Swiss-Prot record:
InterPro entries noted in UniProt: COX15/CtaA_fam, HemeA_Synthase_type2
Binding site for heme: H277, H338
Assembly description: Interacts with CtaB.
Annotated protein name in UniProt: Heme A synthase
Organism: Methylorubrum extorquens (strain CM4 / NCIMB 13688)
UniProt subcellular location: Cell membrane
GO CC, alphabetical: plasma membrane
Gene: ctaA
GO terms, biological process: heme A biosynthetic process
Cofactor needs: heme b
Keyword Oxidoreductase found: yes
Origin superkingdom: Bacteria
GO molecular function, one term: metal ion binding
Role played: Catalyzes the conversion of heme O to heme A by two successive hydroxylations of the methyl group at C8. The first hydroxylation forms heme I, the second hydroxylation results in an unstable dihydroxymethyl group, which spontaneously dehydrates, resulting in the formyl group of heme A.
Annotated family: Belongs to the COX15/CtaA family. Type 2 subfamily.
Amino acid sequence: MRLSTNPTLDRFDAVPAASYRPGHGAVRAWLYLLAVLVVAMVAVGGATRLTGSGLSITEWRPVTGVVPPLDAADWAVEFDKYRDTPQYRILNQGIGLDGFKTLYWWEWGHRLLGRIVGLVFFLPFAWFWARGMLGRRLLTGLLGLGLLGGLQGAIGWIMVASGLQPGMTAVAPLKLALHLTTASLILAGLVWLAAGTRPRALAPAPESVRVVACLLPALVLVQIWLGGLVAGSKAGLLYNTWPDMDGVLVPPARVLFDKVPFIENFIDNLALVQFNHRLFAYLVVAVAIAHAIQAARTASGSAAAGRAMGVAALATAQMGLGIATLLLHVPLWAGLAHQVFAMAVLIMATVHARLARGVPAAAAPTGAEVPIGLEALAGRGA
């Protein structure tokens, strides 16, 4: 049986997917569980950053570091290490042991969650692989994500180490942006693979819809990168007005480009860092809304049109949340919500992009399994 090219005529449960294998339901559930854990990592990492806790653990011990201080002597040792950091000497000299413990638990919890994510990835992965439940493409994608996850741990320590250098009271913004963007790439990869393991075939969306749908996750990732630079440099505290920036829509060039060499302005000039994040947000929302209108006209009534509308709605809501965060001078709850909601936008955009490509049909029907997760939004057709 072949799917028609009209996305409004094909039911998502009409034909089995060619790439589907027995047990893929468990694989799909595992991938979505990992995605949830990565979002939790981003949330805890955001809270760690916003509470200034990220430099409270001064060593990278991937194995033995899982055990926290267990008695007063252990806590004294860890506190002495922290008191030797520039952050303590410059910013936190008045902090006591109880205050240090609060900082420590945030960072320790973030690292512990990273270890848990690693175990939840590698143990089931080995089991699924041994049982032959992973096709070649899925296996390749998972191996790539596993390597990226290991690299992410190293990036995290490199980021922390940058904040322990003389004169530093926080991590380097560029390294923080890299850490956040890598986590986002891992999340997008997990969701992409999960959506691709749906049990039923799906006709691709019209080409014009498909092209823009695949562009949207890339735009969201760039915006997350720019947001990481804002977060790392605290550029969100420089201009707390909107739509203007302290009375002007665009700061003068002498303000935006006052550093030499020129390229450093895009990383270290707080005015330009915030301006770029604002400007790119407008671009993402404009593209998402235009895409939703395009999909509604080109594939009216299809699931692709519904998903496009969902991406546009989430992107617009995220921009509104970002504006509120800015106007409120970045309180912890708003900054954290803005960071986590960015992951929701990325997830929706990634699912939309993957399903817009379609899922090829098998030669003949072979059993049935109910789709779970966001790919169930495929509904009818593409």
